[in-house]
Amino acid sequence: ASGQDFMRF
């Protein structure tokens, strides 16, 4: 997972 992947939540 990328660093910005968590921003999808």
From Swiss-Prot:
Q: What top-level branch of life does the organism fall under? A: Eukaryota
Q: Where, per the database record, does this protein carry Phenylalanine amide? A: F9
GO BP, one annotated term: neuropeptide signaling pathway
* Record-level GO cellular component terms: extracellular region
Q: Does the keyword Ribosomal protein apply?
A: no
Keywords of this entry: Amidation, Neuropeptide, Secreted
Q: Which residues form the signal peptide?
A: none
Tell me where in or outside the cell this protein is found: Secreted
For this chain, the family text in UniProt reads: Belongs to the FARP (FMRFamide related peptide) family.
Q: What is this protein called?
A: CalliFMRFamide-6
Q: Which organism is it from?
A: Calliphora vomitoria
